[in-house]
Amino acid sequence: MHETTNSIPTIFFVEEDNNARRSLTKSLRELGYRVLVSADLEDAFEWTSGTGHIHADLVLVNLLGKLPEEALTIGCRLREHSKYDGHTPLVVMPEKVPQDLLGTDEKVNDLEWICYYEDIEQLKRLLTRLLNKNT
């Protein structure tokens, strides 16, 4: 794949939950994003291996059975493996969310966030902020 020249932000989305993948992909596309979807981490690493480059403006990761810290570490490895520049944001969405964190976003650093997903509006606000996209 080649880098797109239009202004539609591209999200590289790794989602291991089949039901969530379908609904979130649809919602993200309805919000106006170009979404490259991988059903699992192995495929995501395979896509980004070799000489080709898959352009993404943001990496969004939801791995089943992983703690937020584990998902962040894996997401950082994927972002580095993908040869994204030092300015590509990473957002992880933990599978299990403590009730008191539901609907919140935790800033780990300027480029890494944990989204304790409650609804698409929450994710939309975070993505808009990170991608400087006016929706």
Language-model-derived ranges and their functions:
Residues 69-73, 92-116, 121, 125:
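Alpha4 helix (beta4-alpha4-beta5 surface) of REC/receiver domains from two-component response regulators
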Residues 59, 83-100:
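A short, hydrophobic beta-strand element within the central beta-sheet of small alpha/beta folds
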Residues 1-22, 27, 53-55, 83-87, ...:
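Non-catalytic signal-transmission and effector/linker regions of two-component phosphorelay proteins
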Residues 54, 59-86:
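Conserved phosphotransfer microenvironments
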Residues 30-31, 81:
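Conserved dinucleotide-binding and phosphotransfer motif residues
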Residues 35:
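Short beta-strand element of Class I
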Residues 39-58, 62:
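Acidic, metal-coordinating helix/loop segments flanking the phosphotransfer/catalytic sites
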Residues 17-21, 42, 61-70, 96-99, ...:
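Short acidic, S/G/P-rich loop/turn micro-motifs used as interaction or catalytic elements
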